[in-house]
């Protein structure tokens, strides 16, 4: 049995979407059991609409919930020990749940997860890893919004954790890594990015193949399995991709309605357009995983539909089923040992000289 705690009050639509999403996920996840956390009068009426959930869930009433516009510091101060978000995260800490899923306030979720679960010993800062549809297969991009700015060591940790997640999701032995930069040449970019590139290229680690720098237009091509960046750039890239996908969809709809001939052409090509929509739909892989914590927390889009939220639940389920946390801890320990040996032999000065 895989136990998933759900912040039922999270997101723009609350229980109407989160519980409906759980009902969809339950049909496809045979071993799932839900722990629902939320306000009694808001949750109970919705939960009664889904009798099939009653045998695979337990509802825990909470005093409060975290608003979408609440500042992280305020949400933590007011909601600690009281809110549905805090209790859902705390269930993972206490071993009552295997993963947590929330569509709530991103900043609050990051703050509560950080203070409740704490960081894995080998990491400095958490990152949000998102699944990204590409021309080849899905890629993982991190960080897409957890941190603003990152040191070379933090970028390297993101690379290792992203590789662990990719192998967990797609059952591959080796993962290719690229650092997002303003150019592919080694002399370009910020010093921290160049230092991270040197470490990843020099420290040999089984299961991780560093491919060098990639540019923003390479993400959608699927040039690498894992794209590593800091949260500011990663979040902008994500929002641009979402906006572009929406723009393409609207332009196609407009073109199809422009004349009777285009409408007829659309009818003949419906299956092809349906496949295109599925391919570029980021909601299909809705759910960013907070990596670097002593527990698995999945962040769904606040505006997610029930189907989208079920995708986030599926990701949380798969991460537990494939023992992501154990793989991350093992991989980080192993990589840090190899990195320490390299630095002891070569010294930090080697990295500094190569970035000049």
From Swiss-Prot:
Pfam families: FA_synthesis. Its main location: cytoplasm. GO terms for molecular function: phosphate:acyl-[acyl carrier protein] acyltransferase activity. Pathway: Lipid metabolism; phospholipid metabolism. It is an enzyme of class 2 (transferase). GO terms for cellular component: cytoplasm. Transmembrane segments: none annotated. It catalyses: a fatty acyl-[ACP] + phosphate = an acyl phosphate + holo-[ACP]. Keywords: Cytoplasm, Lipid biosynthesis, Lipid metabolism, Phospholipid biosynthesis, Phospholipid metabolism, Transferase. Homodimer. Probably interacts with PlsY. Belongs to the PlsX family. Catalyzes the reversible formation of acyl-phosphate (acyl-PO(4)) from acyl-[acyl-carrier-protein] (acyl-ACP). This enzyme utilizes acyl-ACP as fatty acyl donor, but not acyl-CoA. This is Phosphate acyltransferase. It comes from Bartonella bacilliformis (strain ATCC 35685 / KC583 / Herrer 020/F12,63).
């Amino acid at each position: 049995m895989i136990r998933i705690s759900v912040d039922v009050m999270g997101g723009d639509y609350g229980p109407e979407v989160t519980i409906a999403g759980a009902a969809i996920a339950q049909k496809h996840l045979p071993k799932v059991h839900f722990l629902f956390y939320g306000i009694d009068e808001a949750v109970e009426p919705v939960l009664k609409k889904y009798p099939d959930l009653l045998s695979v869930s337990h509802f825990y009433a909470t005093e409060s919930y975290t608003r979408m516009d609440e500042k992280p510091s305020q949400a933590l101060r007011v909601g600690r020990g009281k809110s549905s978000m805090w209790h859902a995260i705390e269930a993972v800490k206490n071993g009552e749940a295997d993963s947590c899923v929330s569509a709530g306030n991103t900043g609050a979720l990051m703050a509560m997860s950080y203070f409740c679960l704490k960081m894995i010993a080998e990491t400095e800062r958490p990152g949000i890893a998102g699944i990204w549809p590409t021309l080849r297969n899905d890629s993982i991009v991190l960080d897409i919004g957890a941190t603003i700015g990152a040191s070379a060591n933090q970028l390297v940790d993101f690379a290792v954790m992203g590789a662990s997640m990719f192998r967990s999701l797609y059952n591959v032995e080796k993962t290719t890594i690229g650092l997002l930069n303003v150019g592919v040449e080694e002399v370009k970019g910020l010093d921290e990015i160049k230092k991270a590139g040197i470490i990843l290229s020099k420290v040999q680690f089984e299961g991780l193949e560093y491919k060098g720098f990639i540019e923003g237009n390479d993400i959608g091509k699927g040039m690498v399995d894992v794209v590593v960046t800091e949260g500011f750039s990663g979040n902008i890239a994500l929002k641009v991709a979402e906006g572009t996908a929406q723009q393409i969809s609207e332009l196609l709809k407009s073109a199809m309605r422009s004349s009777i001939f285009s409408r007829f052409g659309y009818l003949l090509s419906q299956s092809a357009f349906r496949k295109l929509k599925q391919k570029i739909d980021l909601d299909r892989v809705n759910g960013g995983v907070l990596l670097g914590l002593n527990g698995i927390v999945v962040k769904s889009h606040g505006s997610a539909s029930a189907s989208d939220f079920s995708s986030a639940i599926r990701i949380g389920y798969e991460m537990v089923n494939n023992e992501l946390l154990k793989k991350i801890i093992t991989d980080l320990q192993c990589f840090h040992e190899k990195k320490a040996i390299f630095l002891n032999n070569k010294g930090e000065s080697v990295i500094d000289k190569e970035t000049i």
